[in-house]
């Protein structure tokens, strides 16, 4: 299967996960890293889409931080 668009590197995902593990010896399998990377990608794309819709609803031509801040609470609840 060929990847299209941006992806999160496994090293980055691993680093992000390990920053929040209490036990520094915790290991994450390659498959788990791949799944978390895909979840992050879906989350970011969904945040972008919702931010664009929010900007359009406000009659704006560009998305700004304010639109992202408005959609994040519901996005977090949906995930």
Swiss-Prot record:
CDD domains referenced in this protein's UniProt entry, alphabetically: HFD_CENP-X
Keywords annotated in UniProt: Acetylation, Cell cycle, Cell division, Centromere, Chromosome, DNA damage, DNA repair, DNA-binding, Kinetochore, Mitosis, Nucleus
Gene Ontology terms: cellular component: chromatin; FANCM-MHF complex; Fanconi anaemia nuclear complex; inner kinetochore
Residues recorded with modification N-acetylmethionine: 1
Location of this chain's protein in the cell: Nucleus; Chromosome, Centromere; Chromosome, Centromere, Kinetochore
Transmembrane segment boundaries: none
Superkingdom: Eukaryota
Primary site of residence: nucleus
Assembly mode: Heterodimer with CENPX, sometimes called MHF; this interaction stabilizes both partners. MHF heterodimers can assemble to form tetrameric structures. MHF also coassemble with CENPT-CENPW heterodimers at centromeres to form the tetrameric CENP-T-W-S-X complex. Forms a discrete complex with FANCM and CENPX, called FANCM-MHF; this interaction, probably mediated by direct binding between CENPS and FANCM, leads to synergistic activation of double-stranded DNA binding and strongly stimulates FANCM-mediated DNA remodeling.
Family: Belongs to the CENP-X/MHF2 family.
Protein name per Swiss-Prot or TrEMBL: Centromere protein X
Species whose genome carries this gene: Bos taurus
């Amino acid at each position: 299967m060929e990847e299209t668009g941006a992806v999160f590197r496994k090293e980055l995902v691993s680093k992000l996960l390990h920053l929040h593990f209490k036990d520094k010896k915790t290991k994450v399998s390659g498959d788990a890293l791949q799944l978390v990377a895909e979840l992050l990608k879906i989350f970011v794309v969904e945040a972008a889409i919702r931010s664009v819709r929010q900007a359009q609803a406000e009659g704006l031509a560009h998305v700004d931080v304010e639109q992202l801040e408005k959609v994040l609470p519901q996005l977090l609840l949906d995930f």
